[in-house]
């Protein structure tokens, strides 16, 4: 048996007022087991009456049983899922198969039985699937919410100083948009954005979170004494109900290449709760696309695939899989960062308007491309990054993942061409990027490029769900061939300049070697290595 803290019960009661079909409780329930199905004989499962506590879960509804006489312990916990067998028995009873138990629940009133029946129907096929469920595979959703249910993953995002500080600055810098307003936080996670909204003077914040992180957000709300301001609601925005419309929607819905994870569709769906002339933070997103040249990256992926070109690997011929291996490696988008000087043309910008675009607009995104090439070289593929703007009443604030901006946990993304193309300065590179949404909460990315006025073209289709995380933390190197002066002479000139600054130390017995050091004793390190 596990303990049920009083605050958990209060949370369930609070959530019930907002989403009654997935968060509610029933007292005075007599629970019986079916001892003999043919004779319909029943035995009491628990001594005395019980209370059923229903709470939302990404897979359905969790049903916890506690005694009416002692609510401090959970007697049993069940999961009501889409395949749960259940049937009404008379006006106050309900038969349900949970795990290995065939139970009959006798409720204290007709109304309680009817509401419980709706709870069950809410997660069964009797009820139409939500927009989220229709577009998402169950296995993908389960993995997704499990991932974001870990504190370590929330910490990874919260410790992105650029991300977190930009959101706080955008919200606090536009306090007039939040003062005494009703705010909706979509995909709240730890609730950090909800806290920022309260700092800006929000009257009420509804923090919606579908993963198990909701329980931790609730703990933070209570420990910071803002439960009168922030209401944490476990559930998906596509499925929960709010008691009122909101003035502002805040969220951090961006994924790699802006669109990955398809959280933007959830963000747009939340507009059904937004008052006319309401605000969205962020307001719009710009996806930037540019052709790039990087022989090192291309060779790295190509050589990985050549593993499968071995004809005698421990006596086994692998070459039959070389073609498939090559295809798999080049289907992987590369997540890392780079020097923007590898880009061969000015980026093309594709705008997503969070205030006006529709969810359906993000199911198939077609982006026409036209690049005027600025430098001759080999185009190995396309680079992607995004910026989002917070358009506030007082000021506009930008969050950028550009290679010229401070690095964020989104990095940048590059998509390689299996067959690179040589292109000259002054030529025009045209084509299209097609982002086709899939039920794995991601996109299939198809690239088609063509050098205008020629027969030269190249294409590739990549799986954004399966990226290669290449970033190592090492400093970004300048592209080869970008030095216009001798790097060696530049370095020694810098050293000599530093040495002249320290020359005065030599007059006081200091030691200087090649201009390095200020009274540094190098013999200690040579004779006594650590």
Curated annotation (Swiss-Prot):
Catalytic activity: L-arginyl-[protein] + 2 S-adenosyl-L-methionine = N(omega),N(omega)-dimethyl-L-arginyl-[protein] + 2 S-adenosyl-L-homocysteine + 2 H(+)
GO biological process, one term: positive regulation of ecdysone receptor signaling pathway
Binding site for S-adenosyl-L-methionine: 154, 163, 187, 209, 238, 266
Gene3D superfamilies: Hnrnp arginine n-methyltransferase1 (2.70.160.11), Pleckstrin-homology domain (PH domain)/Phosphotyrosine-binding domain (PTB) (2.30.29.30), Vaccinia Virus protein VP39 (3.40.50.150)
Protein name: Histone-arginine methyltransferase CARMER
UniProt xrefs under CDD domains: AdoMet_MTases (cd02440)
Any one GO molecular-function label of the UniProt entry: histone H3R17 methyltransferase activity
Chain positions found as Asymmetric dimethylarginine: 501
Keyword Cytoplasm found: yes
Gene: Art4
Pfam family, one: PrmA
UniProt entry keywords in alphabetical sequence: Chromatin regulator, Cytoplasm, Methylation, Methyltransferase, Nucleus, S-adenosyl-L-methionine, Transcription, Transcription regulation, Transferase
This enzyme's EC code(s): 2.1.1.319
Posttranslational mods: The dimethylated protein is the major form.
Role played: Methylates (mono- and asymmetric dimethylation) the guanidino nitrogens of arginyl residues in proteins. May methylate histone H3 at 'Arg-17' and activate transcription via chromatin remodeling.
Compartment annotation: Cytoplasm; Nucleus
Location of the SAM-dependent MTase PRMT-type domain: 141-450
